Amino acid sequence: MDRVSLFHGYLPIEPADRMRRLKELEARVYSENQTQLFIETPYRNHKMLEDILKTCRPQTKLCIAANITCEGEFIQTKTVKEWKGKLPELNKIPCIFLIYK
C-alpha cells in the first residue's frame, strides 16, 4: 500500500477533544498507512507537543518542522519515546507536526 499524507490544519483547542483527535489520527497512521500533518498556533506549540507525547504510542514517529526556510530552521524526526525529556524550544515559532510509522 502506498503511503498517503493528510493535512488537518489546526486540531481542537480543548484538551480532551485534542487528545481524542490525536488518538484518531494515530489510529489512521497504523490502520491506513497514512502520515498525519497538523499545525498549531505558535504560542500553543509546547502544549501540543506535550499532548502528542502523552497520547501517542512510544514507537510512533513524530517529525517537528519549525521555522521552515528561515534562520534557525529546525526539522527533526524521532519516535515519541525518544522525544520525551528532550523537547526543543518551539515557543512563538511556526511549526508543522507530522506523525507516522
Regions found by a protein language model. Name each.
Residues 31-101:
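A contiguous loop/helix-start segment that scaffolds small-molecule binding in enzyme catalytic cores
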